[in-house]
């Protein structure tokens, strides 16, 4: 049975792990790194680059290099958070026909799950290369505060990448799994997981208990902000640099996409450097030019300056911590361990703020980049039956309910309810002889339904005529272990029923997902074709170079017609190398090999002659000593 891999699909970086021989193995990618940038670039020749290769060319291809797409997944174009990103991203964010936020590259509209699927495909391939077998199943992590639409969209991304998503689990929960199974501490412990990643922030309060030799992980509460992370920290630095440069040079870099991409790279680098040093220098020659000539950017940033720029962002993480503690029904002093997850938690100011709130130093023995993928791999081994000593009880992060008379949100399932769960409630009609009811489903904490996230709606029709308040409509909410919602409505009088799995009320339709799966398969073939063509070109190029070199050395030993034939074959191969397909190049390679046969024979004959001459010279050079005497000896036997 093939293994279920664990994937941390991050905003900035992704990571893949697997349980191997009872141990979690974080798998290195083709570039030798344990994490992969969640960046996808679409090239003009149709090739798709993922990870470090995509990141390397971002400066020269900013409009077609997509990063931080996780911030858009499962979101509406009109959402405030999306509108804010439109002005900041060098690539285009566009409105899809269904109202979702999509991106555009090479003149084509692309759904965020498609972009995420490209990253997931790279993680799948990384795992397959390590395991030496095909991988078809995965556990994928999401921020704990992701709503239903965002979870569905992540599941869709997995399907497009050719993976059956066995479970969607929350990132802080996964980190707690990795921490809890790695440590030998006995007894019950309450831990806080503070997860500040590239695009999202989560905090979860989790109880780890030993129950009859089994480790039980129970999430008591979760809270967060799905639009707060390292990308926002980078943006503060970029805005500061743009402001300083404008003051100094009078040039506004915010409209120059090429400059912005270089600034993005420099800001991220500066932020990382300032976690270990007090000062860093941003040096970007030829950042732009005006009538007076090229302009260079040179700016020193201190750690204190960075902390001042991002202080408000760090402060924004504390309120969710407060709410999570309150919802869990615990005191801060009852928290035994604080675990930091996500690259941003390496920033000293973040660690300081966490210590200030929780009153204790956070643990330093958890790898913030790898813990989430490790936990996902552990959950994968639980689902495949390899591990039986772990029980995971997660929660739904936000309340779920329906809109009732007066636009009120009637909550069916409260936030932080352990999942899977099921809840039913009976409602009735608002008007006399009402033939149908519309069930509108919402997710959120506001009292008025319109203030919450609309997840979808459906009708229950064929209600027999009756005075208002008389028909009995039973509405049932059912959340599965992935945190995905199924809703049904039943007329108790007639037994008529209608049910839906809540798809994001836009989201991707089944047809669209199938089309994207087929596109992905076709792309895999196209990628294979491009790679094969590149290899053929390289080999042909090497042959041209080697033949030319040999022709220079041995050409005079050939007949004029033989030499001309080789030169003609080289020219034909070079012509076809520019834009020919694999078959055309192969044919010309064959022709050059045939034409070069005589040249090969001459080279071989020359080498043989040279070796013979060398051997002869060596034999002649051996010294002859006339005073050598043959030894004469006789065996003497001793008495025993």
Swiss-Prot record:
Q: Name one GO molecular function term.
A: ATP binding
Query: A Pfam family name for this chain?
Result: HSP70
Q: Return the InterPro entries for the record.
A: ATPase_NBD (IPR043129), Chaperone_DnaK (IPR012725), Heat_shock_70_CS (IPR018181), HSP70_C_sf (IPR029048), HSP70_peptide-bd_sf (IPR029047), Hsp_70_fam (IPR013126)
Region Disordered: list its residue ranges: 614-640
Provide the alphabetized UniProt keywords: ATP-binding, Chaperone, Nucleotide-binding, Phosphoprotein, Stress response
Q: Does the keyword Nucleotide-binding apply?
A: yes
Compositional bias (Basic and acidic residues)? 619-640
Annotated S-S bridges = none
Q: Using the record's annotations, give every residue carrying the modification Phosphothreonine.
A: 200
Q: Which residue windows are transmembrane per the record? A: none
The keyword Chaperone belongs to this UniProt entry's keyword annotation: yes
What is expression of this protein induced or repressed by? By stress conditions e.g. heat shock.
Q: Which protein family is it in? A: Belongs to the heat shock protein 70 family.
Role description? Acts as a chaperone.
Tell me the NCBIfam families matching this sequence: PRK00290.1, PRK05183.1, prok_dnaK
Q: What is this protein called?
A: Chaperone protein DnaK
Q: Which organism is it from?
A: Bordetella petrii (strain ATCC BAA-461 / DSM 12804 / CCUG 43448)
Gene responsible for this protein: dnaK
């Amino acid at each position: 049975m093939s293994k279920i891999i664990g994937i941390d699909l991050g905003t900035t970086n992704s990571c893949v792990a697997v349980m191997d021989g009872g141990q979690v193995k974080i798998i290195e990618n083709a570039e030798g790194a344990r994490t992969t940038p969640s960046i996808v670039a679409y090239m003009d020749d149709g090739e798709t680059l993922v990870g470090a290769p995509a990141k390397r060319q971002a400066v020269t291809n900013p409009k077609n290099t997509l990063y931080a797409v996780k911030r858009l997944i499962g979101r509406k174009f009109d959402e405030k958070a999306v509108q804010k990103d439109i002005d900041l991203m060098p690539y285009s964010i566009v409105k899809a026909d269904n109202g979702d936020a999509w991106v555009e590259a090479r003149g084509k509209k692309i759904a965020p799950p498609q972009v995420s699927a490209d990253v997931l495909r790279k993680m799948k391939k990384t795992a397959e290369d390590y395991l030496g077998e095909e991988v078809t199943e995965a556990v994928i992590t999401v921020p704990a505060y992701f709503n239903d639409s965002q979870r569905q969209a992540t599941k869709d991304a997995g399907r497009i990448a050719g993976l059956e998503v066995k479970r969607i689990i929350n990132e802080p929960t996964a980190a707690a799994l990795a921490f809890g199974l790695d440590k030998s501490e006995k007894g019950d412990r309450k831990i806080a997981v503070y997860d500040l990643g590239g695009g999202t922030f989560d905090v979860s309060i989790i109880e780890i208990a030993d129950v009859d030799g089994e480790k039980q992980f129970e999430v008591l509460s979760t809270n967060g902000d799905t639009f707060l992370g390292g990308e926002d920290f980078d943006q503060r630095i970029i805005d500061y640099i743009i402001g300083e440069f404008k003051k100094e040079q009078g040039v506004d870099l915010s409209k120059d996409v090429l400059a912005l991409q270089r600034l993005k790279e420099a800001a991220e680098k500066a932020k990382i450097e300032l976690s270990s040093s007090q000062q860093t220098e941003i040096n970007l020659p030829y950042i732009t030019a005006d009538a007076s000539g090229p302009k260079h950017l040179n700016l020193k940033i201190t750690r204190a300056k960075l902390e001042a720029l991002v202080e408000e962002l760090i402060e924004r993480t504390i309120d969710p911590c407060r709410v999570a503690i309150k919802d869990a029904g615990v005191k801060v002093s009852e928290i035994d361990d604080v675990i930091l997850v996500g690259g941003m938690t390496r920033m000293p100011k973040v660690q300081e703020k966490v210590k200030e709130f929780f009153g204790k130093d956070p643990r330093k023995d958890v790898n913030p980049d790898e813990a989430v993928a490790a936990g996902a791999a552990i959950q994968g081994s639980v689902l495949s039956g390899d591990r039986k000593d772990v029980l995971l009880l997660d929660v739904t992060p936000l309340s779920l309910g329906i809109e009732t008379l007066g636009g009120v949100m009637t909550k069916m399932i409260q936030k932080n309810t352990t999942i899977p769960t099921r809840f039913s409630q009976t409602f009735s009609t608002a008007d006399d002889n009402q033939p149908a009811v519309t069930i509108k489903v919402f997710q959120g904490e506001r009292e008025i339904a319109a203030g919450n996230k609309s997840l979808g709606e459906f009708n229950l029709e064929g209600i027999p005529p009756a005075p208002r308040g008389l028909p009995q409509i039973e509405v049932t909410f059912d959340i599965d272990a992935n945190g995905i919602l199924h809703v049904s409505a039943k007329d108790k009088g007639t037994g008529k029923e209608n049910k839906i799995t809540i798809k994001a009320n836009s989201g991707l339709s089944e047809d669209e997902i199938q089309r994207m799966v087929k596109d992905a398969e076709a792309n895999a073939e196209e990628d294979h074709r491009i790679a094969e063509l590149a290899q053929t070109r390289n080999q042909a190029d090497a042959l041209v170079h080697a033949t030319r070199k040999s022709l220079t050395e041995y050409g005079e030993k050939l007949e004029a017609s033989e030499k001309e034939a080789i030169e003609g074959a080289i020219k034909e191969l070079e012509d076809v190398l520019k834009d020919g397909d694999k078959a055309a190049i192969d044919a010309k390679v064959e022709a050059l090999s045939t034409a070069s046969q005589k040249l090969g024979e001459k080279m071989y004959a020359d080498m043989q002659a040279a070796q013979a001459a060398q051997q002869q010279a060596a034999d002649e050079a051996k010294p002859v000593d006339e005073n050598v005497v043959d030894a004469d000896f006789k065996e003497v036997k001793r008495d025993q």
